[in-house]
Amino acid sequence: MIRAYEQNPQHFIEDLEKVRVEQLTGHGSSVLEELVQLVKDKNIDISIKYDPRKDSEVFANRVITDDIELLKKILAYFLPEDAILKGGHYDNQLQNGIKRVKEFLESSPNTQWELRAFMAVMHFSLTADRIDDDILKVIVDSMNHHGDARSKLREELAELTAELKIYSVIQAEINKHLSSSGTINIHDKSINLMDKNLYGYTDEEIFKASAEYKILEKMPQTTIQVDGSEKKIVSIKDFLGSENKRTGALGNLKNSYSYNKDNNELSHFATTCSDKSRPLNDLVSQKTTQLSDITSRFNSAIEALNRFIQKYDSVMQRLLDDTR
């Protein structure tokens, strides 16, 4: 006989270790191996932890998913047998329950589980037509919705921030020539915007995986002569004149701009570039605020799930205590 995990998880694990997988109800389940692999792939840790409020005997904390055979026994313990009559009511109910288990494991951001909470959630998922299952579904759906929105915002914000970074590199180069009252060539003697060092990268492979590089590789290129050989660069003019970016193309570009105190075209050029990037800066601020808000909502959904599981565990524990 295997003692209940709700009353003493240490005794439950000890009893499981004494039996073979073949002796457990779900040993022949068609999804047993799949669920074992899913738990491994999601790096889910299931542990038993001594809780003085619940456990009468002290025991050592233990991560039980380190033992694959034990993990298989835990899953086989709560899994029911496959239905004999395929397509019947029981089979449909069972398949829906297993589907909920998979969806929960795949979508839950929580990878650290105490045994009692994990087993409770698994039982929730396998049992149909219960209000606690509906509550869990609402919470998980909320987490998925906000998680997807957060991922999309992060990607968009990374692209916007990268384009703004390229503008800041260009602005710094213009300011350098302004301070020396000089002339900036933005064409064949331009800085190469493909230079990783301009953005603080030291490793070429890391730079090539960056959001800045993904924008720059869509730009046209200028061929220049370096020590008698040809080299392709992305010049300032290439970048500003391209439509392949969020801010679009800047028209009527010259190859160079000079400082002149009477008609300072270099200063005008600096202002034009600044005006071009200003809406982008405003958009970055807006998206950053949105990301902060959606992250807060995502974290609230996780907190709600944890509170629900803790509350359920507390209620179940009181019910179990009353039956002793």
UniProtKB/Swiss-Prot annotation:
Q: What organism, scientifically named, is this protein from?
A: Yersinia pestis (strain Pestoides F)
Q: Source taxonomy lineage?
A: Bacteria, Pseudomonadati, Pseudomonadota, Gammaproteobacteria, Enterobacterales
Q: Quick check: keyword DNA repair in the entry?
A: no
Q: Pfam families in the record, alphabetically?
A: LcrV (PF04792)
What InterPro entries does this protein map onto? Answer: LowCa_resp_V_Ag, Vir_assoc_V_ag_sf
Primary location group = secreted
**Any one cellular-component term (Gene Ontology):** extracellular region
Where can this protein be found? Secreted
Stated name of the protein? Virulence-associated V antigen
Q: Which residues form the signal peptide?
A: none
Write out the function statement from the record.
Possibly involved in calcium regulation of YOP expression, which includes the export process.
Per UniProt, which keywords does this protein have? Plasmid, Secreted, Virulence
Give the top-rank taxon of the lineage listed in the UniProt record for this protein: Bacteria
